[in-house]
Amino acid sequence: MEHTDVVIAPVLTEKSNALRQQGKYVFRVAARATKIQIKQAVTQLFGVTVRRCTVMNVFGKKRRVRHRTGRTSGWKKAIVHVAAGQSIGVLERA
């Protein structure tokens, strides 16, 4: 798996903005990506030292359109803890 295939997009929410000030960055990642692959991808793409990586599965929600019910797709989220004094500049400006 290529590094650009592992990290799909940053998650930009109020909670992720609060975590960013603590040196933690939230990313949407590939469903089959492991912690080691995520750590290597973030290091290669952004040039930072990753101390820790927390991964969780976000389950899809039930949605209803008129009389039909369905589900949204689930996805995988990673919270990456960056070494003290380092930051991902691209996300700081977002």
Swiss-Prot record:
Pfam family, one: Ribosomal_L23
This protein's GO CC annotations: ribonucleoprotein complex; ribosome
Keyword Amino-acid biosynthesis: no
Coiled-coil ranges (or none): none
Entries under InterPro entries matching the protein: Nucleotide-bd_a/b_plait_sf, Ribosomal_uL23-like, Ribosomal_uL23/eL15/eS24_sf
TM stretches of this protein: none
Keywords linked to the UniProt accession: Ribonucleoprotein, Ribosomal protein, RNA-binding, rRNA-binding
Organism domain of life: Bacteria
GO biological process, one term: translation
UniProt-recorded Gene Ontology molecular function terms: rRNA binding; structural constituent of ribosome
Gene3D superfamilies: 3.30.70.330
NCBIfam families linked: PRK05738.2-4, PRK05738.3-2
Protein family membership: Belongs to the universal ribosomal protein uL23 family.
The protein's role, per its UniProt record: One of the early assembly proteins it binds 23S rRNA. One of the proteins that surrounds the polypeptide exit tunnel on the outside of the ribosome. Forms the main docking site for trigger factor binding to the ribosome.
UniProt subunit comment: Part of the 50S ribosomal subunit. Contacts protein L29, and trigger factor when it is bound to the ribosome.
Descriptive protein name: Large ribosomal subunit protein uL23
Organism from which the protein derives: Treponema pallidum (strain Nichols)
Gene: rplW
